[in-house]
Amino acid sequence: MAVQESAAQLSMTLKVQEYPTLKVPYETLNKRFRAAQKNIDRETSHVTMVVAELEKTLSSCPAVDSVVSLLDGVVEKLSVLKRKAVESIQAEDESAKLCKRRIEHLKEHSSDQPAAASMWKRKRMDRMMVEHLLRCGYYNTAVKLARQSGIEDLVNIEMFLTAKEVEESLERRETATCLAWCHDNKSRLRKMKSCLEFSLRIQEFIELVRQNKRLDAVRHARKHFSQAEGSQLDEVRQVMGMLAFPPDTHISPYKDLLDPARWRMLIQQFRYDNYRLHQLGNSSVFTLTLQAGLSAIKTPQCYKEDGSSKSPDCPVCSRSLNKLAQPLPMAHCANSRLVCKISGDVMNENNPPMMLPNGYVYGYNSLLSIRQDDKVVCPRTKEVFHFSQAEKVYIM
């Protein structure tokens, strides 16, 4: 029963931690499947049209040259259809193989061989670090770590490198790359009710006004804002008011609209939509796992001002992690455990807690080990007491 519960807990842990490992390649496979379907349907319709034209021509006793020309057109369309089909199938096959490779890797966690299990855990740690580095913008370091650990097929480097290109273009105050990304994911973004493309068009309008190209700005508004409604219509009305003010105006809200910091907001909006598109959280799995681990062992003793109760073996008590764990909740403990300050052993019926006259509690076995001439010295206050003065503590 205990083994089954442990296996179930491990399975649940994998589902939580490894969700991005399978979800991202699955979404890529799904996207390529839909793109292939559209391409093949489009090319098939082209073939159908030229075949229909050929049949219509043949019904009226045409000249040989015209028939040959139409046949060449049919052959050309069939060649294009074949090429598009082969390319689409190859792309789908690559995505399917990637999904299979990652599934096989996740199955290795249940290996009975200690060495194999240890290697799998090491790879999982490297995968978490690669994803965290990619999220933080350390792309070269992440790629080197993935290559060194042999986990390039197990991490989502391609997705983050694509995002890197988009973010860098926005940092250069260019919208073309991000708009192309929006076009590639148009159907999914529409289902998500994303406003990223609209925000980009608004920014393009603002830049035209900044450059004093007001006539171009009006044309841009007619082209892209004619279908705006609801809150978007209110935003359009606001930016249209910029036409009445100079680019260096200090009047709000037009001054805020002209603030270059809006480009940073667009980067954040793209990043948010990109994570939603691939159903990823805003924090890396490494961050979430670290926070969960710190919270599981965090106690009030880790934050005593005098530092007397801090343990050198406790990660939360360490200087590097103590501040990081500060906003996290304390560990949930249904049953308290008393740990001896001297030995670090749990105090229980085999090592009952004993209280000295000064109020400090230690394990019975520890007091026996430091007793000299029937006297014990309190490690904290250096006070000396007779061993018989220690009283047994009972916890209700």
UniProtKB/Swiss-Prot annotation:
Pfam family for this entry, one: CTLH
Record's signal peptide: none
Record SMART domains: CRA (SM00757), CTLH (SM00668), LisH (SM00667)
Modified residue annotations for Phosphothreonine: 28
Domain LisH: residue ranges: 121-153
EC assignment: 2.3.2.27
Record PANTHER family: E3 UBIQUITIN-PROTEIN TRANSFERASE MAEA, MACROPHAGE ERYTHROBLAST ATTACHER-RELATED
Function noted in UniProt: Core component of the CTLH E3 ubiquitin-protein ligase complex that selectively accepts ubiquitin from UBE2H and mediates ubiquitination and subsequent proteasomal degradation of the transcription factor HBP1. MAEA and RMND5A are both required for catalytic activity of the CTLH E3 ubiquitin-protein ligase complex. MAEA is required for normal cell proliferation. The CTLH E3 ubiquitin-protein ligase complex is not required for the degradation of enzymes involved in gluconeogenesis, such as FBP1.
Full protein name: E3 ubiquitin-protein transferase MAEA
